[in-house]
Design a protein with these regions (language model features):
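Non-catalytic tandem-repeat scaffold regions and their flanking low-complexity/translocation tails
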Residues: 1-238
Length: 238
């Protein structure tokens, strides 16, 4: 973290932001320098998050904001409302960090191309949670989201969680999709077997003990009847 000294010298500030990789240096600039386009541009090129300290007018500067979100998608949070509704700006942001979708306008959260780009990002829970309800019910998009985030199925529409065909595809991509599947399909032997097969493959380079433990954890989400299925219990032991 930088110290609390306010920098008023333009050349000193330019040198400081060029060397700073944290995005915090601009915080110590004078108000005049926070409104200096060249200073702010240098700052966001190094770390887009510096946009949060820029003058409000520069947070609405389209070219500058694009530079910022290309470097750090999180910078979209600090962009003006008009730029949060700008398709190109938001696309650049979600290409860098899918979950930047949370800062986009509602209209763009309903834009299929924008959301498809966002869900491609590997993130723990992924960007699907920020998509419109309509797109959470989009089969192709949800399956694409699962490729980037094993937990994405949590945010899928309930109709998809109860759709056998969709769930079979989902558990083949990520066995963990079983966690959020409808109770009816947790009692579907083929669905559970496909989820287990995915785990067997995912843990093929692990020890047999690690693989068995992972499968046992997964089977806790199957129906009670299938948890006691001899074939599935054998897979968990092998």
């Amino acid at each position: 973290m930088p110290d609390n000294k306010i920098i008023t010298d333009r050349e000193e500030m330019l040198e400081t932001v060029k060397k700073d990789g944290t995005g915090f240096a601009l915080m110590n600039a004078s108000d005049t320098l926070k409104a200096d386009r060249e200073v702010v541009l240098e700052a966001v090129k190094n770390n887009g998050a510096a946009l949060q300290y820029a003058d409000e007018a520069l947070q609405a500067d389209r070219e500058l904001v694009i530079e910022a979100v290309r470097e750090n998608g999180y910078a979209l949070k600090s962009a003006s409302d008009s730029l949060k509704a700008d398709r190109e700006v938001v696309l650049e942001a979600v290409k860098n960090w899918g979950s930047a979708l949370q800062f986009a306008s509602d209209t763009l959260k309903s834009d299929r191309e924008v959301v498809l780009e966002a869900v491609k990002d590997n993130d723990i829970k992924g960007a699907l949670q920020f998509a419109s309800d309509t797109l959470k019910a989009d089969r192709e998009l949800v399956l694409e989201a699962l490729k980037g985030s094993y937990a994405a199925f949590e945010f899928a529409d309930d109709t998809l969680k109860a759709d056998r065909e969709v769930v079979l595809e989902a558990v083949k991509i990520s066995g963990m999709a079983l966690v959020w599947t409808s109770d009816t399909l947790k009692d579907d032997r083929e669905v559970v077997i496909e989820a287990v097969k995915m785990y067997v493959n995912a843990y093929k380079n692990s020890t047999s003990g690690e693989r068995s433990a992972a499968i046992r954890r997964l089977l806790k989400y199957a129906s009670k009847e299938l948890q006691n299925d001899p074939e599935l219990k054998k897979l968990a032991k092998d």
